């Protein structure tokens, strides 16, 4: 595997309580929202103080900016499955993709080219063989920082990665597929992820909720917690049937879940297809 070295000064040592090879337990995928030149410039700028371990351009070239043994500055404030501050425990991969800030004239997100995805799969296979990165810990930036980040986006082909043995993608339950319109093309059904429209703004139910809504909401929060999302503070510990749940605050977390697991159904709500999918994924992650 050919790798182009383009060192960044933005890194720090990993925790020293274990050999660094054992500390690496997460793989975090991002998009740059910039072209290659601007991406490399920013990720190597001392003033910006951000970085990642690898950048993959649209033609599939792989650049290494930070050595695996060091912690790159890519995750920021983050949480996944009980672990906070994932810079210390992760490898960060940035894909050159213009993302949500650069939609085409039809409002479509730019697809991930097949050459880029092929290189990503090769790199992920290499990293998973080298370090104890389990399938449950292959995540997107939006999974670990849902209130701040939306990359790699709903157009990222998680299915394609899962078919290559990287991460997980269980088939959609029939009810969720029918309700969400997922029976059509899924992102990742081909070598290159297809274009997909940008997500709408979240619409969340007003509180207080009805007893039935509150029960579904509480079940959804518990499912997201079981999967690994940070739902701390969103469940106020009260009686769910009394509507003591913060629907507005958790909408970004629901959207992050939908971007990952229900990418053609983005509304920030625990509606029936979302709740069904969340409970299915939670069972897989338990």
Residue ranges and their predicted role:
Residues 100-102, 146-150:
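Short, well-ordered, mixed-charge alpha-helical segments that flank or form enzyme active sites
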Residues 133-148:
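Acidic/histidine-rich, metal-coordinating catalytic segments
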Residues 117-132, 148-286:
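Cell-envelope/ECM-targeting effectors and their regulatory/trafficking segments
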Residues 110-111, 144, 207-208:
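Short, contiguous strand/loop micro-motifs
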Residues 1-136:
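Active-site-adjacent loop/helix surface patches within enzyme catalytic domains
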């Amino acid at each position: 595997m050919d790798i182009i070295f383009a060192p960044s000064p933005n890194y720090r040592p990993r925790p020293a309580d274990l050999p660094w090879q054992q500390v690496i337990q997460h793989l975090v995928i991002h998009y740059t929202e910039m072209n290659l030149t601007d991406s490399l410039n920013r990720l190597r700028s001392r003033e910006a103080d951000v970085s990642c371990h690898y950048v993959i351009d649209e033609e599939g070239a792989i650049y290494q900016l930070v050595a695996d043994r060091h912690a790159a500055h890519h995750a920021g404030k983050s949480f996944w499955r009980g672990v906070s501050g994932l810079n210390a425990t992760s490898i960060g991969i940035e894909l050159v993709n213009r993302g949500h800030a650069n939609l085409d004239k039809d409002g479509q997100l730019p697809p991930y080219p097949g050459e880029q995805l092929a290189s990503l799969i090769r790199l992920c296979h290499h990293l998973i063989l080298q370090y104890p990165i389990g399938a449950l810990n292959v995540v997107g930036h939006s999974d670990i920082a849902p209130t701040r980040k939306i990359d790699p986006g709903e157009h990222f082909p998680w299915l394609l990665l899962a078919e290559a043995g990287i991460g997980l993608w269980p088939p959609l339950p029939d009810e969720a597929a029918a309700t969400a319109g997922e029976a059509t093309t899924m992102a990742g059904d081909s070598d290159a992820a297809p274009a997909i429209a940008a997500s709408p703004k979240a619409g969340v139910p007003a509180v207080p909720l009805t007893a039935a809504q509150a029960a579904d909401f509480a079940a959804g929060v518990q499912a997201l917690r079981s999967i690994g999302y940070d739902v701390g503070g969103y469940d106020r510990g009260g009686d769910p049937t009394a509507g003591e749940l913060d629907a507005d605050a958790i909408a970004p977390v629901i959207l992050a879940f939908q971007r990952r697991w229900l990418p053609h159904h983005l509304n920030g709500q625990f509606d029936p297809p979302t709740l069904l999918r969340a409970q299915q994924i939670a069972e897989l992650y338990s």
